[in-house]
Amino acid sequence: MVDLIIIGGGPAGLAAACKAWESGLRDILILERDKELGGILNQCIHNGFGLHRFGEQLTGPEYAGRFIEMLKETGVKVQLDTMVLEVTPDKKVHCVSKEYGYQIIEAKSIVLGMGCRERTRGAIGTPGTRPAGVYTAGAAQRY
């Protein structure tokens, strides 16, 4: 059993982990489905992040990087490339990853920091089955 599981390693999850550590929790686990921490911040290449927290303008990846560096100074554990399948009322998190396989992890507390996702081409009603050259903003920023 862990004290705190944070589902999502984006801005909310990173901030929650840092604050929980600052507040004295020591057995903290972040479960992130992507291969890296940062979430949507990794797609936000414009300035404007960090004014309140760090006193300077940062891009999304720079802002995420600051939190990631802060986490490295703690004992917060991170499992990347981990898909959460279910969260039960008795605070058991069912998840799966290549590295650890299928796991059921029990927690005293759970924070849901799953954030936002860009809607797919189909969800926004882009017509056709093969719209060559049509990319969402998030897809374009990845390449």
Q: PLM features: what roles do these ranges have?
A:
Residues 2-62:
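Beta1-alpha1 glycine-rich phosphate/pyrophosphate-binding loop at the start
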Residues 1-7, 65-143:
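FAD-binding core/adjacent interface of flavoenzyme oxidoreductases
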